[in-house]
Amino acid sequence: MHISRTMTPVQDLPVETVERKGFGHPDTLADGIAEAVSLAFSRACLDGAPGAVLHHNVDKVYIGAGHITRRYGAHELLKPAVVRINGRMSASFAGEDLGIERIQTEAAERYLSVFAPHYRVGESIVIEPNATQHTNRPDWFTPKSLDDVPDAKDPRASDTALCVAHAPASPTEHVVRELEYALWDWSGDTPRPRFCDVGQDVKVFGWREGRTLDVTACVPLLSDSVASHDAYQERIRHLESELQGIADTLADGRLDVRTRVNPTTSGEGYREYMLALGSCIECGEEGVVGRGNALNGLINPLRPRSMESPFGKNPAYHTGKVYGHLAQQLADDVHARFGVACSVWLTSPNGFPLLPPRNVWIELAPGEGPGDRELTDFVQERMAAFQVPGDLLVQRFRR
């Protein structure tokens, strides 16, 4: 394990920029569907005859290409959007069919019902299960027994992938992420849209200079609920006022925040951000896994970032998923235990034992944190407590 004290906390930089693609953004929908399908398949394997997570990866999900026209108070569906679940997935175990098309379809439909609630499967959106079993490894995706799933007993790093995570969130990151979360009601078992006239394809962008944070939020209104341009502008003004108050509360005096909502919707050549069903997949936009938020729910250009997207990857052995979650857990634990900002970097050579990672780097700010021995012991203890796939079988909507 390597420990260094060379990190400059991002909140100490003169400029900081952070972005979040909301839950209804095409890329975020693709990430979420991929993860939902992977976890549904993993649970089915663990609860069924295999008793272990079988080989699969569905980290190439595609969504988009719909066509809906909209106008004040109405819309017309011309072509449904499509969800294409690309990847590979074990189709049978010991000769018994696992029903993977049903698993893919039902998992995607459940996810869409939460985060794209105005879409109707079979009407405005179509789900195409497309996972194959193509490989040059005999029985890899049609195992006759767990002897054909060697990683079930001896998990090894499936790839040489570097994953990095950070804690805590900076004040800017906190405002940007939580501002989009504020458009949802989190009081139940699953989140629900807070406003019935607001779509889910939201983007929040923050630019901080010194302690001044400018936030731009792009928030779609649903066309069926908008009677006119004047009504649109009035609703946007109300949303802007409400989000400004939420941003001020989130900043808690640490930043001076200015919030704009849909700034292109007034003046000459204005453009309204108005959608029929709440996501730009309805107007030709497309989303694929790995183009959006990192595991922490943000796009942070000024922080090191994992090159692997974890969404849809096998939770039993894929380094790009396991190390991403483990790095974030370690960063959170170090911050919670010692009250210091840190970055955690993890990697292992392909084929080496998955846990613990072969290479661990903990980076702290100069002069901060415990001694190297105490920190090493703590990190090793936390790594030993990490369970695969058990700690990765819950889809976390909120960080």
Write out the residue ranges for each language-model feature.
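N-terminal, Lys/Arg- and Ser/Thr-rich interaction peptides
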Residues: M1-V18, T142-R156, G210-V219, G292-S306
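N-terminal, positively charged regions that mediate nucleic acid binding
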Residues: M1-V53
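Short, hydrophobic beta-strand segments
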Residues: V18-R20, A81-R88, L213-V226, M307-K313, ...
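Glycine-rich, N-terminal phosphate-binding loop and its surrounding beta-alpha-beta segment
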Residues: R43, D47-G122
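A short, glycine/Asx- and small/polar-enriched loop/turn
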Residues: L77, E209-L213, G267-R271, P353-N359
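Glycine-rich, mobile lid/loop segments that gate access to catalytic sites or pores
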Residues: E106-A247, A251-D252, V257-T265
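Long, well-ordered mid-to-C-terminal structural blocks that present hydrophobic/aromatic surfaces
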Residues: R237-P304, K313-A336
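Internal helix-turn-beta structural module
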Residues: H335-R399
